[in-house]
Amino acid sequence: LIGTGKSVAALSKLLPDPDLAYMARYALERIPAEVAVLALRQAVIQTRGPTQIGIINSLAAREDEGAAGILIELLANADQEVVGAAVNALGKIGTLKTAAALERFQGTAPDSLRRQVGMARLAAAQGLARRGQRSEAAKVFHQLYTQETFDPLRVGGLRGLIMTEPTQATELLMAALTEGDGPLRKLAVRLLVEQPADYPLAPFLEKLPTLPAPEQVALLEVVRLRSESSARAAVRNACDSRETEVRLAALRAMAAVGNAEDVIFLAKVAAGEAPECAAGRLALASMPGPEPDRTILEQLPGAQPPVRIELIRALAARGIRAGATLLPDQLSQ
């Protein structure tokens, strides 16, 4: 587009025309001159129905803070589609004024718009955070996290709180992991994975044996995804859990955090019963580093037959070329 402020007068005349308004809006959205946004503000007052909704969307696309007053007035419009568009626009603009207006409106909004208003409040809080108004954003995030029942709002509120109040991240994540329901637990797992490499998992691992099985599985998945070697002892203990799902999750994590000391243990698991045998076999094949390779080579000749079979399988799975010299002797046994 090459439109300038000189084009605005001609374009603004097209805004009331239902057939031409779209292209006029498209052009005006992209003209940086102040006169372009003034034309959109004027037109949103003068139009109705789909055309008005389109202009509201254009004001939202420009994140026009100067249109906030007009959009707030439109929250009282009789046309619910217009109201919905105004709600979205106020969220997109994301200032203290629009966030406050959305909070007030949420108390009186019709049921059909409540979730939409909540999502707009979430967008407004994200806008405040981007502008550096972190404490104001955190207040909105906290309300959404603690007061809403719609999962995307609670999840968005928690994510926003951790972003704006990082000193509370451990407390918030611990609560979500140990006290939250499915969506919050899943988010806690994702957020733990996203934390910096030096983020301490120790407080969470201390709670591991006391957590319900689903939460233990979730935390073990975090360990696996982060390859958290410092968690090895906790993971090894979880391999002895009474819960099958926890044992399997721990064995999957051993693939990422196990070491040479775990070779025989995993080989015995692999030689055992399903479903753990497959997980043990995969962990034995996947443990990082060369040390497990050396242990496999050292332990293979003297191992009991079921364990020896699993160590031979691990030779192939890990591509341990030095093991080729041992195989002829194994064929004679």
Language model features: what each stretch is:
Residues 2-15, 33-45, 53, 64-76, ...:
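Amphipathic alpha-helical scaffolding segments comprising HEAT/armadillo-like alpha-solenoid repeats
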Residues 16-20, 47-48, 78-79, 109-110, ...:
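Short inter-helical turns and helix N-cap capping residues of alpha-solenoid HEAT/ARM repeat scaffolds
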Residues 115-118, 138:
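Start-of-helix signal in alpha-solenoid helical-repeat scaffolds, especially tetratricopeptide repeats
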